[in-house]
């Protein structure tokens, strides 16, 4: 995955939460980050919803969210556009999915027991991953790794 700090505007990086090599944004910033990434020629490398607190983080769900691989007949700019369109569609499905919303509420209730006064909107972040044309990424391998991590917890 690519380091977004090398490509994205400073104002978008300033509103991100960074932990290690991962950058995360709030829901309100997602479309702007997607648009800026597309303009820079960065493809979506997937994403994960997390509750982030000073004490740690908790994934909203263990399902992997990765766009499809680049097709042989697809140019890089075409793939970049498609990867972000698939990502936007996945975001919308997540926001419309009542089961996921309920899971988030259950997780957040546990977090609130240890973090007094914390509001859900202040803790919900979306970790985004990026790819460049120079990277050859095996999405199926990523999915297996992410799902095995989820199954082990």
Residues covered by each model-derived region:
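Short, solvent-exposed polar/charged micro-motifs at secondary-structure junctions
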Residues: 31-32, 54-62, 134-144
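Amphipathic alpha-helical binding modules
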Residues: 91-148
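Alpha-helix boundary/N-cap detector
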Residues: 3, 21-28, 70-74, 78-86, ...
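Short acidic DE-rich linear segments
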Residues: 150-153
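Long, hydrophobic N-terminal alpha-helical segment
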Residues: 1-27, 33-34
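Generic structural signal of hydrophobic/aromatic residues within well-ordered alpha-helices
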Residues: 12, 33, 83, 87-91, ...
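Amphipathic alpha-helical packing elements
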Residues: 48, 53-97
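Amphipathic, interaction-prone secondary-structure segments
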Residues: 27-56
């Amino acid at each position: 995955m690519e380091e977004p700090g090398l490509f994205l505007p400073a104002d978008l990086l300033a509103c991100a939460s960074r932990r290690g090599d991962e950058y995360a944004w709030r829901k309100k910033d997602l479309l702007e980050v997607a648009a800026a990434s597309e303009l820079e020629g960065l493809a979506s490398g997937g994403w994960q919803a997390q509750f982030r607190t000073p004490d740690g983080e908790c994934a909203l769900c263990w399902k992997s969210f990765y766009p499809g691989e680049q097709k042989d007949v697809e140019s890089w700019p075409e793939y970049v556009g498609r990867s972000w369109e698939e990502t936007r569609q996945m975001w919308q499905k997540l926001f419309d999915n009542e089961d996921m919303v309920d899971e988030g509420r259950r997780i957040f209730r546990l977090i609130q027991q240890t973090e007094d006064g914390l509001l859900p909107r202040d803790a919900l972040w979306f970790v985004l991953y990026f790819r460049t044309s120079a990277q050859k990424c095996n999405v199926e391998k990523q999915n297996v790794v992410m799902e095995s991590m989820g199954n082990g917890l």
